Swiss-Prot record, chain A:
GO terms for biological process: cell differentiation; cilium assembly; intraciliary transport; protein localization to cilium; regulation of platelet-derived growth factor receptor-alpha signaling pathway; spermatogenesis. It is found in: Golgi apparatus, cis-Golgi network; Cytoplasm, Cytoskeleton, Microtubule organizing center, Centrosome, Centriole; Cell projection, Cilium; Golgi apparatus. Transmembrane segments: none annotated. One of its GO terms (cellular component) is ciliary basal body. The keyword Coiled coil applies. Involved in ciliary process assembly. May play a role in the trafficking of ciliary membrane proteins from the Golgi complex to the cilium. Regulates the platelet-derived growth factor receptor-alpha (PDGFRA) signaling pathway. Plays an important role in spermatogenesis, particularly spermiogenesis, when germ cells form flagella. The gene is ift20. Residues 74-123 form a coiled coil. Keywords: Cell projection, Cilium biogenesis/degradation, Coiled coil, Cytoplasm, Cytoplasmic vesicle, Cytoskeleton, Differentiation, Golgi apparatus, Spermatogenesis. It holds the Pfam family IFT20. Its main location: Golgi. This is Intraflagellar transport protein 20 homolog.
Amino acid sequence: MAKDPLAEAGLHFDELNKLRVLEPDVSQKTTELKEECEEFVDKIGQFQKIVGGLIELVDELAKEAETEKMKAIGARNLLKSVEKQREAQHQQLQALIAEKKMQLERYRIEYEALQKVEAEQSEFIDQFILQK
Amino acid sequence: MRLKTSLLKEPKHRELVSCVGWTSADELYSCSDDHQILKWNLLSNDTSVVVKLQDEIYPIDLHWFPKTVSGKKQAVAEIFALTSSDGKLHLVSKSGRIEKSVEAHRGAVLAGRWNYDGTALITAGEDGQLKIWSKSGMLRSTLAQQGTPVYSVAWAPDSGRVLYTSGRQLVVKPLQPNSKVLQWKAHDGVILKVDWSAVNDLILSGGEDCKYKVWDSYGRLLFSSAPHDYPITSVAWAPDGELFAMGSFHTLRLCDKTGWSYSLEKPSTGSLLSLCWSADGTQLAGACGNGHVLFAHIVEQRWEWKNFEITLTKRRTMQVRNVLNDAVDVLEFRDRVIKASLAHGHLVVTTSLQCYVYSAKNWNTPLIFDLKEGTVSLIVQAERHFLLVDGAEVYVYSYEGRLISSPKSPGMRMDILNSQSISLSNDTIAIRDTTDERVVFLFEAQTGKAIGDGKPLIHKIEVVLIALDQCGSSNDRRIALIDKNRDLYLTSVRKLGRAHSIYKIGSMVDTMAWNDSANILCGIQDNRFTVWYYPSVVFVDKDLLPKTIFTKDSSEFSRPPQMVSYVGSQVTVRRVDGSLVCTAVSPYPTLLHEYTSSARWEDALRICRFAKDQTLWSCLAGLAVANRELSTAEVAYAAIGEIDKVQYINFIKDLPSKDSCLAHILLFSGHVQEAEATLLQANLIYHAIQIHINLYSWDRALELAVKYKTHVDTVLAHRHKFLQDFGKQETNKRFLQYSEGVEVDWEKIQAKIEMEFAKERERAANSSVRSSVSVRR
């Protein structure tokens, strides 16, 4: 076939007989490329979304792990401090007990003295009655 | 007794509270590191911010200007001193306005205290300096300078000395330059707080060695506590000097002045950085390390007398329990109870406005009267009336609520009197001077005037404790006193023309008390419990004193104990550890005193015969001689084997006239001068001379003879005989001079003496028969 003068002039007709500047092959391929590119962008977008979600998820997990870790540390500390608190309370109660013991000792001494007085007095009364 | 504490749920301050101070009994100011000064009203339970200080002011110490300034009393304090960590001293008004700020120290100002009369302020700084400021905040002087910070400072009761901390040491420095500084090592750690009570002159210190200690003003240790778990961060004397409070981490303790602890509280306050008592001594406030302000008041205080037991159950409520039948009465008051006293069958209670007087027979209807000032710091009771120390004055009221008298003495600070420096009996008030402790002022209770010529009793050295006897007539009123050397003296209050004779009746006496129903004295002498059954015996027959004393071992009391009461035949003593120990004294001496005071001599003799006790007989002998009851005295002296005295009494009984009888009884008691005066007054001059001849006081005998121009030869003759007997030469110039002109003729002298006796007999016969009978009865 002879060379199409139009083709030489760089003009082509497509299937719909519309005048085109590009060769139909090239044009088709271009379109295909474009479509493929779009597809690729879409896929990349999707991939990004998925990865983003994943990252978020992992982040959340990390956060949760962190709080749990803090909680665990806190609990451990609390346990320790309860021990200390108990010790302090124990100390306080011991001090109070010591105080009460001292008071008891004072009362005991007073009671003994009073008992002695009572004995002396009853002895005196007996003596008094006997002599009369 | 214990402290009832109250804390709010949430602290009002955001940061630690560093200091607190009362303005009145119901209003408190507190300062905190959040730069706020809060005012707490306890009546309305309001808390309001007085002022927010500048951000660079971190308050450290606050002290209100004293209310009593030179006797004049202000209703409320108007200004306070505030020290801060930036080295400044601020004078702040009640409304919170900073009147004056001065650069006081380098580094923080750790303490600031007004003296008792408000004329000076002392500040102590981290730079180790002590500075004294005038009332208006002008620097007067730098009292001391040292290498370590001064954490705490306190004024002496007389405001003439200052106590401050120096690391582990305490220093007492007089304001006067060049006077002696007292310094001693007090604690094993840094001392954080000190306080000095104006009333009992005792020093309190607390430090990082977790102990608190009580010292006297000479630096002698009286009490040291067991170590606590945390350092002692605050100590404070109650205004009446009977109690103190001590604060530490989560710890508040109420202690007696002798150091033992009444109660321990464990409030969640953090460290108690500062403690402050209200002026009436009923409320305590504490500055807490966790931003709280702690309030506390005393409850469960107890009073006992015979079969009654009274407990302060709440601030305004008392419970009276009769132990015999378990009857319980509840007494309600309109205001807070400030002071109470139970003795002699009456309960006296003071609140901030009124005084209530209850009789033990009737707890329903008290007698109520209004108080003059309303800050009663001391109540002393006697059988017929009671005494209130109210602010700067002393008032004596009858149990019917009538004001009897108000003794005054210029220059005396009545507000710092305590139970050891004042004593009351039915007719007399004795008050130890507050400036010169050797002086004891004596007043008539009925009029409030000074007794006799108004001269006070002045002892050789400082008097520690005074006590008046409670029974008998006012002319026989005796005062017992213990001085600084722990010697016990007895003297009579009304001297009636005689010289003040003061007798030492005991040594190493720690404490003593008179009985409430007889003039019997008991005390702890040299570790032995001692009862002077009849201490006044020293005025009639000194030799009898050791025989009228009853002693028993007092190891059960420990040393040094305190006498709480001596009621009836029961003595109550408080040991050093705070326990009360009762001991019984024989009831016979009380009975004996009762019989002799109502002149039932037969009964007195019978009781002595019944008890068969030498001490009792000695007592009776003394009592009989004091009452000129010769026949009883004779029996009593015979019973204790004092034959010489029996003989002398017989001789006295045979004397013809009343006057010579009286003179010889005086002579029997060793009162030569009075005996001589009695005889001279009765114109029995020869007898007076004879007394002196018998006592070998030749000079006085000759003096009398020459003065009355009679019996000069008698004196010379006796003197001559005396010298001859001892083979001596006459050296006395007066005798040499008179012997020249006088001839000694024994016969003539004998005749003259006979004549004197005859004359006396004649005169006695002429005088009314009745009087001579009464003498010889």
